[in-house]
Amino acid sequence: MFKKLLTLLLITTLFVVISCQSSHNPNEAKYKAAYVAVNGIMDSGNIDELDTYIAADAVDHQMDPSITTKTGLAGIKEVFTYYHRIFPDLKTTVYSMAVSGDTLFGYISSTGTASEPFMGMPAGTSQTMNAVDVVVFKDDKMVEHWGFMDMSDVMKMMQSNMAGESKIEDKGK
């Protein structure tokens, strides 16, 4: 009886250990480190470091055509350069990350002070934007990105842009 119980306990322990190991993503730490590094590059403006983390043909689904018409890594570098010029004191905090397969999900908050007029905001305006990023990796490099901004932050930015403006214009008077 004792041998059967000991054997059952050993098999159960082995099963638990194997199932825990098989569900672990071996790339998780690498993907998280790359995501933190890329956010640090956005803050520092050292765009040449992006080559280490982002594929040359990467697709950013959040690319703003008013900033650049370039695609891939070249376009991403232009966007990073643009935002670093506008917000030279940008500080991004990564609050949470999760990895599922080849996809990383990150929750961040970025704060910076505009060095020049930006989207209707005067220079010197401080702005905080919270966002969720979805990043797909292939061959240890980021190949796709979607960014979703917190709409309450967007509304605050829009309201600060409209300060002093009349929201309803009476053309009859």
Language-model regions: role of each:
Residues 6-7, 82:
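Hydrophobic residues within membrane-embedded alpha helices
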Residues 7-8, 34:
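General helical structural elements
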Residues 20-173:
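C-terminal and inter-domain tail/linker signature
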Residues 1-5:
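Positively charged n-region of N-terminal signal peptides that target proteins for export
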Residues 8-17:
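Bacterial N-terminal signal peptides
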